[in-house]
């Protein structure tokens, strides 16, 4: 149950009955301090100001119309007009029981929407590097979260699989095949791309053949498409291994590359011209947007077709949004693309809406993110200044975690050691990113992310194993816990309340695409459990009813931690 939404609705009705303006927001929040109750409504001041009356006077009127005696022990007015709500321990215990009995932790059922999530988007014939990490893992956390809530999620891997460079790559692939060197791993493709560029720059005969292949590929030539497909397949087979290592849910079926939209581009340019939105300007086709001004204060021109007939990323993005409405019937489209692309996307979407390609009800959202920086505050690079390949980063994460786990468990079996190191190492890299507000840059620091203290993956994974181990030591089946949850101690209520706040947390993450909110919640939950564990004996509780109640809270904690980490794509292990 979403307590915040429930209280917001109740207080909103009471505000209306008290004569507050129709647009008044109750502004219900979880209280920061226990003396202010469990929840606080902060919207009275704003409403009272509009009405021209003292906030406390309005607050008193609201309380006359507020009926939440079945869920709250006490409701009080504090300060100038805050409404503090103290929830009943009996009611909180009941909500915890409902969560424990439900495989989805009693999450509020949603009206399913079709949500397209555009993320990862590597390029063909290039290895994935650290620049792809944020889009890939933040986008995947969003996909997992929305799927868990019951939405129809369509993952869209917008692969860079089209463009003039493919003439050069096809010509070089042909050359390599003639030299019997056709079987390439993606590691060779990095060198392959450089060698192809070298041939293109230095050999005019090769360059002419490459230009010819571009024309043939765009015209649908079967030979060129076969060679192009081979380049795409080699790339994606290797990328798929990286996705599996990262525990990312993307598959080859999720590829919706630039080539998918290419057949739509001539029609879109013609249509924008026919609608009077696009005009010829210095040989190119341009859309002038009043919403964006250049340095001279004139409408900014957005090129959709170059003088030589070539199309731009903007044209593809216009086609992409149109396709996602017409073919995928999307209600929402979430783009996990870095913040530097914001204006480009906004311009493309402005054209899309002006052209009437999507309905007003369809939401296009740029869930932008900042950069990953080294300890020096500069973009994360190798020591020699090169781009860090994602496979190298994940290898190092595994090695560092292996050293750490081996030190703590010198007698552990090698296979188990490697599995735990894999889960901890990859989890550490992902969690370090996901736990930061995605809109900001963040510092990549091995020591911090692999620490067993603080808001890190190792701490969270250890917290889960610690809670799960209680049940093993109890040697009791969950079905044998027949006594109800009872909250008589402050730490019991604090833990139970935090557990049932999972609903409102995941709702916020789904709405805003902010996995750091889930990380903060899980860290706080783990700390609440620590306080509960230290102050409320579980297995040594003298009263069996109390013992069963506390075991139930421990079980719900383990399930909530595991489910929360799963929405982030972070694995857990049974022991560390």
From Swiss-Prot:
Keywords noted in UniProt: Aminoacyl-tRNA synthetase, ATP-binding, Cytoplasm, Ligase, Nucleotide-binding, Protein biosynthesis
E.C. numbers: 6.1.1.19
Designated name of the protein: Arginine--tRNA ligase
Enzyme class: ligase
Membrane-spanning segments: none
Disulfide pairings: none
Substrates-to-products reaction catalysed: tRNA(Arg) + L-arginine + ATP = L-arginyl-tRNA(Arg) + AMP + diphosphate
Gene Ontology BP terms: arginyl-tRNA aminoacylation
Subcellular localization(s) per the UniProt record: Cytoplasm
Cross-referenced PANTHER family: ARGININE--TRNA LIGASE, CYTOPLASMIC, ARGINYL-TRNA SYNTHETASE
Gene Ontology cellular-component annotations: cytoplasm
Subunit structure: Monomer.
Motif ('HIGH' region): 122-132
GO-annotated molecular function: arginine-tRNA ligase activity; ATP binding
Family listed: Belongs to the class-I aminoacyl-tRNA synthetase family.
